[in-house]
């Protein structure tokens, strides 16, 4: 903010004509004698903390007013003091806040309207302190000191909860849950600073890599990686549609001049992409909340529609992570977020849906063969009131998965939710990759004016936020980290067969086997199995090694014996170790049947690469 302060005999103004950004007001003229005239330009950087900027401006105005022994203040918007102005909405808010705070402190304040062409007269007193300029930096608001969250391990059977701390944390016997608890309590291990293995894998396996011509944390996806990402998106789509969700699509950018959009965005702090276009300040979304909430606001919602679920694959979502925090697919600035929001009539319905969606989130771990660790987070009031409900869920979870859960209790609500569950995969370095989540939002319906029309009148509903898998990139991250853990145990690392870009590689021993090998690969493709045929001029042993490096689940070697017997020699990666491949003899039909059984109920897409390996291009 820039300010010009003039100690004046008087200031008189009259608003003559509106501009496009004029505020609506009836105060079109005014005069104040013996005043401090404050000409103010609100700047773009003030948008990060409008309240703090207003407080900083008031403190500076007050200092000068006290020096001059002045009680009359004119707040006069004056854009000509800066070439880097804030949005009109922010400027009006800051100017009104300055007026309001000054009045609260006992000053007589006249504020000229924003966005009008105005005529004004001023008489400067002409003494050494009569003309002063100031640059205002936002005053940091003092954070409320309060009780911190507490973390507990609980025994669902006895309903005993044990508060966790650095001294007793090793009572947790499950290594993955222990790693999650250490992370939550801020207990860091030395190996956490190492680079996770998936960072190497994503490049080695031709999945994706950083795009140097873009902002850090943005990836380019190669055909194999794009295929994997699309398959995961198809998987989530099928899951949520079966849950009763209606897919929608909304914009990726939003106008921060909308008060509800700004307030919701500000809940997430500074880690956002914001930019200006003309007089508008816009932001790139970090989730699908904004568009879905605006859509729900315009719907005429009736109780019989509820619970109402809208789903969007938020491609792309943006989060401006600090550069030093960017780590492969775990922390990036552009990601793909499956995002479902459920409108619930009341808290009772919301809790029922929360429970159902929690189990659907856990199902994704079963389907993806990922080991999940669970932490529930509740405000103290909510937990105290619904303790029995929570322990019922925890007990059912323990009975099904044999695992305990961690519980975080917040002394009071500081977010839009009163309860949530976060589900994490633990990477090979013992760090959590938080993926699925369900949250009970008690705030956003009112903020966005989302209403349900009942016989008794309009009510604000409860909204659940749910991402059944977490971001697609983090799912891949978790799968690759799991593969690294398997490799540490001596097992052959691999991805699920349905998600593997190449499911079968056919390798001919000699040129005379090429035609037969090609027919095998073609028949596999005809049966919706992603197969290719290695016709490169390399030794058979090197071709087999290459297939191993690419984690191909099934490798078929075709020689004279295979052609004569119609029995294929198949290396099955799932049963192999790093030192010893596992091989079986089977017919082509048996191989097809085996793969179809393994991939049943999972989405399929064809391999977007030539069937001949010699024609498949290299991307780096």
UniProtKB/Swiss-Prot annotation:
Binding site for Zn(2+): 289, 341, 465
An annotated GO BP: threonyl-tRNA aminoacylation
CDD domains: ThrRS_anticodon, ThrRS_core
Outcome recorded upon mutating residue 124 to A: Still charges Thr, 80% editing of mischarged L-seryl-tRNA(Thr), no mischarging activity
Cofactor note: Binds 1 zinc ion per subunit.
Domain of life of the native organism: Archaea
Keywords: Aminoacyl-tRNA synthetase, ATP-binding, Cytoplasm, Ligase, Metal-binding, Nucleotide-binding, Protein biosynthesis, RNA-binding, tRNA-binding, Zinc
Activity regulation as described: Not inhibited by 1 uM borrelidin (BN); probably does not bind BN.
Subcellular location: Cytoplasm
Enzyme Commission numbers on file: 6.1.1.3
InterPro entries reported for this sequence: aa-tRNA-synt_IIb, aa-tRNA-synth_II, aa-tRNA-synth_II/BPL/LPL, Anticodon-bd, Anticodon-bd_dom_sf, DTD-like_sf, Thr-tRNA-ligase_IIa, Threonyl-tRNA_syn_edit_dom_arc
Keyword set includes Cell division: no
Effect of residue 118 to M: Isolated domain does not deacylate mischarged L-seryl-tRNA(Thr), no activity on L-threonyl-tRNA(Thr)
Cofactor(s) needed: Zn(2+)
Region: Editing domain, residue numbers: 1-141
Effect of residue 117 to A: Isolated domain has nearly wild-type deacylation of mischarged L-seryl-tRNA(Thr), no activity on L-threonyl-tRNA(Thr). Intermediate deacylation of L-seryl-tRNA(Thr)
Family, as annotated: Belongs to the class-II aminoacyl-tRNA synthetase family.
Domain remark text: The N-terminal domain (about residues 1-140) is an archaea-specific tRNA-editing domain that has a highly similar structure to Dtd (D-aminoacyl-tRNA deacylase). Editing of incorrectly charged L-seryl-tRNA(Thr) by this domain is tRNA catalyzed.
Function per UniProt: Catalyzes the attachment of threonine to tRNA(Thr) in a two-step reaction: L-threonine is first activated by ATP to form Thr-AMP and then transferred to the acceptor end of tRNA(Thr). Also activates L-serine, but does not detectably transfer it to tRNA(Thr). Edits incorrectly charged L-seryl-tRNA(Thr) via its editing domain. Has no activity on correctly acylated L-seryl-tRNA(Ser) or L-threonyl-tRNA(Thr).
Annotated protein name in UniProt: Threonine--tRNA ligase
Lineage: Archaea, Methanobacteriati, Methanobacteriota, Methanomada group, Methanococci
């Amino acid at each position: 903010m820039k300010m010009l302060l003039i100690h004046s005999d008087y200031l008189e103004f009259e608003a003559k004509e509106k501009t496009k950004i004029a505020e609506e007001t009836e105060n079109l003229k005014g005069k104040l004698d013996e005043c401090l005239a404050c000409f103010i330009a609100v700047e773009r950087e003030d948008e990060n903390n409008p309240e703090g900027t207003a407080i900083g401006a008031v403190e500076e105005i007050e200092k000068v007013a006290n020096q001059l022994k002045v009680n009359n203040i004119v707040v006069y918007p004056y854009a000509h003091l800066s070439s880097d102005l804030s949005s009109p909405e922010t400027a009006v808010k800051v100017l009104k806040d300055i007026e309001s705070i000054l009045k609260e402190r006992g000053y007589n304040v006249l504020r000229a309207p924003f966005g009008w062409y105005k005529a004004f007269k001023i008489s400067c007193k002409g003494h050494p302190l009569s003309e002063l300029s100031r640059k205002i930096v936002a005053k940091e608001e003092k954070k409320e000191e309060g009780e911190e969250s507490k973390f507990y391990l609980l025994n669902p059977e006895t309903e005993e909860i044990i508060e966790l701390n650095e001294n007793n944390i090793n009572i947790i016997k499950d290594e993955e849950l222990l790693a999650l608890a250490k992370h939550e309590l801020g207990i860091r291990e030395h190996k956490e600073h190492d680079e996770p293995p998936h960072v190497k894998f994503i490049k080695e396996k031709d999945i994706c890599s950083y795009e140097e011509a873009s902002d850090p944390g943005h990836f380019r996806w190669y055909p194999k990686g794009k295929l994997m990402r699309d398959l995961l998106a198809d998987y989530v789509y099928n899951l949520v549609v079966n849950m009763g969700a209606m897919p929608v699509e909304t914009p990726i950018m939003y106008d921060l001049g909308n008060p509800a959009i700004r307030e919701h965005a500000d809940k997430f702090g500074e880690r956002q992409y914001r930019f200006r276009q003309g007089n508008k300040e816009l932001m790139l979304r970090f989730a699908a909340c904004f568009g879905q909430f605006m859509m729900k606001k315009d719907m005429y919602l009736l109780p019989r529609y509820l619970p109402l679920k809208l789903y969007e694959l938020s491609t792309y979502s943006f989060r401006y992570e600090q550069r030093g925090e960017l780590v492969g697919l775990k922390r990036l600035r552009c990601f793909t977020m499956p995002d479902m929001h459920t409108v619930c009539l009341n808290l009772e319905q919301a809790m029922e849906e929360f429970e159902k969606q929690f189990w659907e989130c856990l199902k994704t771990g079963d389907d993806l063969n990922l080991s999940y660790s669970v932490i529930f987070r509740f405000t103290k009031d909510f937990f105290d009131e619904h303790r029995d409900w929570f322990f019922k869920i925890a007990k059912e979870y323990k009975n099904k998965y044999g695992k305990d859960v961690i519980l975080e209790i917040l002394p009071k609500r500081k977010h839009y939710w009163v309860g949530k569950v976060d589900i994490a995969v633990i990477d090979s370095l013992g760090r959590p990759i938080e993926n699925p989540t369900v949250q009970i939002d008690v705030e956003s319906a009112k903020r966005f004016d989302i209403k349900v029309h009942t016989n008794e009148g309009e009510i604000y509903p409860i909204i659940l936020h749910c991402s059944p898998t977490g971001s697609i990139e983090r799912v891949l991250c978790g799968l690759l980290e799991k593969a690294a853990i398997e490799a540490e145990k001596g097992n052959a690392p691999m991805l699920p067969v349905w998600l593997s870009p190449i499911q079968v590689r056919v390798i001919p021993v000699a040129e005379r086997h090429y035609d037969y090998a090609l027919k095998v690969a073609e028949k596999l493709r005809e049966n919706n199995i992603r197969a290719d045929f290695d016709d490169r001029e390399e030794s058979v042993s090197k071709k087999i090694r290459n297939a191993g490096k690419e984690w191909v689940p099934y490798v078929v070697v075709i020689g004279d014996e295979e052609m004569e017997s119609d029995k294929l020699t198949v290396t099955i990666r799932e049963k192999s170790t790093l030192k010893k491949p596992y091989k079986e003899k089977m017919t082509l039909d048996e191989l097809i049947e085996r793969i179809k059984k393994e991939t049943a109920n999972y989405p399929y897409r064809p391999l977007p690469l030539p069937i001949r390996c010699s024609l498949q291009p290299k991307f780096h």
